[in-house]
C-alpha cells in the first residue's frame, strides 16, 4: 500500500496560496486518475483504492503530523511508502525535487510530520515557491500571474511523478523526474 499526502491549509481563503501547492498537486493527481475524495477520517480527507491512498490533511499545515501518523498506522503504510508533497522556499518557483528522506529545512508542516512519525525516512516531493525575507507572509501569499503559469507546469509534472511513485520504487521516480 502506498500513500500520497499533499500538504496545505484547508480554509478556502488559502486555496491559491504558495503554502497550498501540495493540495494543488493532489487535486491534479485525482483529476489525472479520475478519482474523487470520498472519505473523511483522522482530520483529513482521502480516497483509497486496493493499491494506494491519496489524501489531504484538513488541519492547518503546521499540524499535519497527527493526520500522517494516524492514517499511515491505521492502513499499515510504512514510512518509505509515503510520499509527502509540500512547498519549499529553498527552491525557486519552477523547481521541484523528489527526495527519499531528509530533515524539514524549516518547513513547519514537514517538521511536525517528522516529529510525530519519529523518522526522517519519508519520501517527499518538494515544490519551489521562491524565497522572501518575510517567510510567514510569503507562504500565505498567492502566486503572481507569471508565477502561476510556471507553477501550473510544475504541478502537472509533480502529479506525474507522484503517480509514478504509486507503482515504482522511489529511486526510479527520482531518476526520471529529478533533472
Swiss-Prot record:
Hydrolyzes ribosome-free peptidyl-tRNAs (with 1 or more amino acids incorporated), which drop off the ribosome during protein synthesis, or as a result of ribosome stalling. GO terms for biological process: protein quality control for misfolded or incompletely synthesized proteins; rescue of stalled ribosome. InterPro entries: Pept_tRNA_hydro (IPR001328), Pept_tRNA_hydro_CS (IPR018171), Pept_tRNA_hydro_sf (IPR036416). It holds the Pfam family Pept_tRNA_hydro. PANTHER family: PEPTIDYL-TRNA HYDROLASE (PTHR17224:SF1). Belongs to the PTH family. It catalyses: an N-acyl-L-alpha-aminoacyl-tRNA + H2O = an N-acyl-L-amino acid + a tRNA + H(+). The record marks 9 as: Discriminates between blocked and unblocked aminoacyl-tRNA. Its main location: cytoplasm. The active site is at residue 19. The lineage of its organism: Bacteria, Bacillati, Mycoplasmatota, Mycoplasmoidales, Metamycoplasmataceae. It is an enzyme of class 3 (hydrolase). Keywords: Cytoplasm, Hydrolase, RNA-binding, tRNA-binding. This is Peptidyl-tRNA hydrolase. GO terms for molecular function: peptidyl-tRNA hydrolase activity; tRNA binding. TRNA binds at residues 14, 60, 62, 108. Its EC number is 3.1.1.29. One of its GO terms (cellular component) is cytoplasm.
Amino acid at each position: 500500500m502506498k500513500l500520497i499526502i499533499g500538504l496545505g491549509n484547508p480554509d478556502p481563503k488559502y486555496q491559491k496560496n504558495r503554502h497550498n501547492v501540495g493540495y494543488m498537486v493532489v487535486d491534479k493527481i485525482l483529476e489525472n486518475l479520475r478519482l474523487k475524495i470520498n472519505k473523511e477520517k483522522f482530520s483529513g480527507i482521502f480516497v483509497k483504492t486496493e493499491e494506494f491512498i491519496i489524501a489531504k490533511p484538513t488541519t492547518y499545515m503546521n499540524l499535519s503530523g497527527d493526520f500522517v501518523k494516524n492514517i499511515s498506522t491505521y492502513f499499515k503504510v510504512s514510512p518509505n511508502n509515503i510520499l509527502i508533497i509540500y512547498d519549499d522556499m529553498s527552491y525557486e518557483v519552477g523547481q521541484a525535487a523528489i527526495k527519499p528522506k531528509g530533515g524539514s529545512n524549516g518547513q513547519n508542516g514537514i517538521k511536525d510530520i517528522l516529529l510525530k512519525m519519529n523518522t526522517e525516512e519519508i519520501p517527499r516531493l518538494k515544490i519551489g515557491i521562491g524565497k522572501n525575507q518575510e517567510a510567514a507572509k510569503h507562504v500565505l501569499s498567492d502566486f503572481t500571474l507569471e508565477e502561476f503559469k510556471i507553477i501550473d507546469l510544475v504541478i502537472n509534472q509533480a502529479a506525474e511523478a507522484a503517480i509514478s511513485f504509486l507503482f515504482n520504487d522511489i529511486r526510479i521516480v527520482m531518476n526520471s523526474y529529478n533533472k
